[in-house]
């Protein structure tokens, strides 16, 4: 889709990296400096998007089919899967349209292409924002279930969960439309970066607090049964490893994209920043990878959901 470089748009077109560039090599930027540029083949990008699409569709179908999964927690997980599905689907659609236009198989006026690009970018941006929000909502839900266990079902009701879901979707669509319309303003990009950092801090604080409570609980059980300290240390190490993986994946998959937005504001013309801008497709691919990993972390670990998914797949055959 015709744009003047990925730094000129919030999401930009997926043709910011030339297809003729080697998969991993050195490219020259506008100042003549040598840059490390990772080019993602269109086939690989579409394949990852398809895997994410299928995975998240299965999660949505499994939760919709099993009434036992119609709880606030699974409501958030289902919406996270739907957001990831839209992230993958919109990026796949944009890539497919660009390839068809490039090959001459699809003819359209420039104005129509630009409008289509705007619509796809709004869908992509809103699904990204909602995905981050639902990750935060899942963290809050788990926090309440641990620290307010006796009052959990009165605090987190299905009606309240649905209101939160509706608010997230409406806010995501509204703000993404504004972000795309005013993406040339530095304040818009900074708002997105601040939002990402806020979600990262929220998740880190909540999960670290939950880990501390789990360690205290394990220590209390160990003292009650007069067990040795290594049992408590084992729980702490396992919890710390899980927390590191969860937050590490979140940061590694989303961080580069928001670093890209930050550098657009701070150093749009600097040679080093220009080199980073060339890897925009890689940053989008990492977000697609996050959409693949999310169901493995939040959905498929549920035995009830796996049983439902197995029944759905067997019935489809």
Swiss-Prot record:
SUPFAM superfamilies membership: Family A G protein-coupled receptor-like (SSF81321)
Domain of life from the UniProt record:
Eukaryota
User: Which residue ranges run through the membrane?
Assistant: 38-63, 73-93, 119-140, 164-183, 192-211, 241-266, 280-300
State the lipidation positions (S-palmitoyl cysteine).
Answer: 315
The GO molecular function terms of this record are: melanocyte-stimulating hormone receptor activity
Q: Which segments sit on the Cytoplasmic face?
A: 64-72, 141-163, 212-240, 301-317
Query: Into which family does the record put it?
Result: Belongs to the G-protein coupled receptor 1 family.
| Stated name of the protein | Melanocyte-stimulating hormone receptor
- What gene is this protein translated from? MC1R
């Amino acid at each position: 889709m015709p744009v003047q470089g990925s730094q000129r748009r919030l999401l930009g077109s997926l043709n910011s990296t030339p297809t003729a560039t080697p998969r991993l090599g050195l490219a020259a930027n506008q100042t003549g400096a040598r840059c490390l540029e990772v080019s993602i083949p269109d086939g690989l990008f579409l394949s990852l998007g398809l895997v994410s699409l299928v995975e998240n569709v299965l999660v949505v179908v499994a939760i919709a089919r099993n009434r036992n999964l119609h709880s606030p927690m699974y409501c958030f997980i289902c919406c996270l899967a739907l957001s990831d599905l839209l992230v993958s689907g919109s990026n796949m659609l944009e890539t497919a349209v660009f390839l068809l236009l490039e090959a001459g198989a699809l003819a359209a006026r420039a104005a129509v292409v630009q409008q289509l690009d705007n619509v796809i970018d709004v869908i992509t941006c809103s699904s990204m924002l909602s995905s981050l929000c639902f990750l935060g909502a899942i963290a809050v839900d788990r926090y309440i279930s641990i620290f307010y266990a006796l009052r959990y079902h009165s605090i987190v009701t299905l009606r309240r969960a649905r209101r939160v879901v509706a608010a997230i979707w409406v806010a995501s669509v509204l703000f993404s439309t504004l972000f795309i319309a005013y993406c040339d303003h530095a304040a818009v990009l900074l708002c997105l970066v601040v939002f990402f950092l806020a979600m990262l801090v929220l998740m880190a604080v909540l999960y670290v607090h939950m880990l501390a409570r789990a360690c205290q609980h394990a220590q209390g059980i160990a003292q009650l049964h007069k067990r040795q300290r290594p049992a408590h240390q084992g729980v702490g190490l396992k919890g710390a490893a899980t927390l590191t993986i969860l937050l590490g994946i979140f940061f590694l998959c989303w961080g580069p994209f928001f670093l890209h937005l930050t550098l657009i504001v701070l150093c749009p013309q600097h040679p080093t920043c220009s080199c980073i801008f060339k890897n925009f497709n890689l940053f989008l691919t990492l977000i697609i990878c996050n959409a693949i990993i999310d169901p493995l972390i939040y959905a498929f670990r549920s035995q009830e959901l796996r049983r439902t998914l197995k029944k759905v797949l067997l019935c489809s055959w």
